[in-house]
Design a protein with these regions (language model features):
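Short, solvent-exposed cationic patches
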Residues: 71-82, 178-187
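N-terminal secretory signal peptides that target proteins for export/translocation
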Residues: 1-8
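N-terminal "domain-start" segment that seeds a small globular fold
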Residues: 29-54, 126-128
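Structural microenvironment flanking redox-active thiols in thiol-disulfide oxidoreductases
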Residues: 73-121
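Short active-site neighborhood of thiol/selenol oxidoreductases, capturing the structured segment around
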Residues: 57-77
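Bacterial N-terminal signal peptides
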Residues: 11-24
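Thiol-/selenol-based redox modules, centered on thioredoxin-like
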Residues: 149-187
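Short, internal strand/loop/helix patches
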Residues: 95-97, 110-148
């Protein structure tokens, strides 16, 4: 009888350990947002001086962000604008998002914004450009990007979840993936 009770209590203890382990794994396992990345919340403004709260204040629940880190990546972002016909296709909400090292002062940020305005003289371009002043490495890590060597086209929602991401210049297959993700989900 003593052996049976010891065995039964061992089985109960083992069962409890298994249940607790399963629960811990379910809670700790990565969900889609953790796997793809998450855009941190921040306040910014377009080059037209319109304030924007990102991601909560995005114009659509699914927005295409063309993220660049270096001036020479502008052509990669431009290839997406041309390839997806973003300047004419109002069905896609989008923005340019250059990620810039924060100079640390309001005057330094103003100087960078003034240089950007020289590079983007058109009001339509300025309205779509939202500079992000932050630590680039932290941004790359949070959003789940591979580094700063290429630009990225990223679909984000208003909660900041990265729903899709592609790297580099426009490509028809990559564009198909982004278009599918940009489509609203019906139930």
């Amino acid at each position: 009888m003593k052996f049976i009770l010891k065995s039964m209590s061992s089985y109960v203890a083992l069962w409890l350990v298994a249940v607790v382990t399963a629960f811990a794994l379910a809670v700790a396992s990565p969900n889609e947002a953790r796997v793809m990345g998450h855009l941190p919340t921040f306040m910014s403004q377009t080059l037209m001086r319109e304030p924007v709260t990102v991601p909560g204040g995005l114009p659509s629940d699914r927005t295409l962000a063309l993220i660049t880190f270096q001036r020479d990546q502008r052509a990669q972002a431009d290839s997406w604008i041309t390839g997806l016909n973003l300047n004419s296709d109002a069905s896609i909400s989008w923005m340019r998002m250059p990620v810039l090292s924060d100079p640390g002062t309001a005057g330094g940020r103003d100087a960078v914004e003034n240089r950007l305005m020289q590079n983007y003289p058109d009001a339509g371009q300025r309205a779509k450009l939202v500079p992000v002043f932050t630590d680039r490495a932290d941004f790359v890590r949070a959003v789940g990007l591979g580094g700063v060597q290429n630009s990225y086209a990223v679909v984000i929602n208003r909660q900041g979840d990265v729903l899709a991401r592609v790297e580099g210049k426009f490509d028809a297959d990559k564009a198909r993936l982004l278009r599918e993700t940009l489509q609203p989900r019906g139930f």
